[in-house]
Curated annotation (Swiss-Prot):
Classification via Pfam families: DUF489
SS bond list: none
The organism of origin for this protein: Marinobacter nauticus (strain ATCC 700491 / DSM 11845 / VT8) (Marinobacter aquaeolei)
Main location: cytoplasm
Gene3D superfamilies named among the record's database cross-references: HflD-like
Keywords from the UniProt entry: Cell inner membrane, Cell membrane, Cytoplasm, Membrane
Official protein name in the record: High frequency lysogenization protein HflD homolog
Gene: hflD
HAMAP family, A to Z: HflD_protein (MF_00695)
UniProt-listed PANTHER family: HIGH FREQUENCY LYSOGENIZATION PROTEIN HFLD
């Protein structure tokens, strides 16, 4: 896997897109369907030719992530930006814990592979697949002491279909966090090379 700023920015955009969709669902009960499919599809990209291929091969697939990334890292201090950043940092922390749990990694990998048939049969945004992926997250990542507190409208979050989407997207966020680390990303980068990431994300949006 390439360790360039380009690849790190793409992976961060994927992570940011998942976090953004979690926020949208938690507050509004809906999100962009194409962006959702991109995130879920990334879980099944096990042998990508490039980082962009993980997300479908086109920059348009992660345009929402690139757009929000260039905004939230600019530290304008908007409450919605802070919330997305919190989700992103929490997912990066959870991925670091997961890396030290090879047995759990194997379980997740095997169960995602089992879900591949559901994905190919029903599509990446079907409730059957989202429920399947949500159960993987609940049975594995959710058992860590560090847990992501999703804030939003309680009535919306109590609906099973919304809870499933949120958990499936958090699992996709972990996938992007893995990709980011594999391409050379680390937490300090978000502080010290933030401006470079913002600049490159904006270049990719042109």
């Amino acid at each position: 896997m390439s360790r360039s700023l380009h690849d790190q920015t793409l992976a961060l955009a994927g992570l940011c897109q998942a976090a953004t969709l979690v926020q949208q669902i938690a507050h509004n009960g809906n999100c962009n369907e194409d962006s959702l499919e991109t995130c879920i599809r990334s879980l099944f990209a096990t042998n990508p030719a490039s980082t962009l291929d993980v997300y479908g091969g086109e920059l348009s697939d992660i345009r929402e992530g690139l757009t929000v990334l260039s905004t939230v890292l600019a530290q304008h201090g908007q409450p919605q930006d802070v919330e997305i950043l919190r989700y992103m940092f929490n997912l990066i922390q959870l991925e670091a814990k997961l890396k030290r749990s090879p047995d759990m990694l194997d379980v997740i990998g095997n169960r995602i592979e089992q879900a591949r048939h559901t994905a190919s049969h029903f599509g990446y945004s079907h409730s059957n697949l989202l429920g399947n992926l949500a159960s993987i997250y609940a049975d594995t990542i959710s058992t860590f002491r560090l847990r992501i507190q999703v804030t939003g409208n309680p009535q919306i979050l109590q609906r099973n279909e919304n809870a499933d989407k949120v958990r499936a997207l958090l699992l996709a966020g972990i996938r992007s966090a893995v990709l980011w680390r594999q391409s050379g990303g680390h937490r300090w980068q978000l502080i010290f090379t933030r401006k470079k990431v913002i600049s490159h994300a904006r270049e990719l949006l042109r």
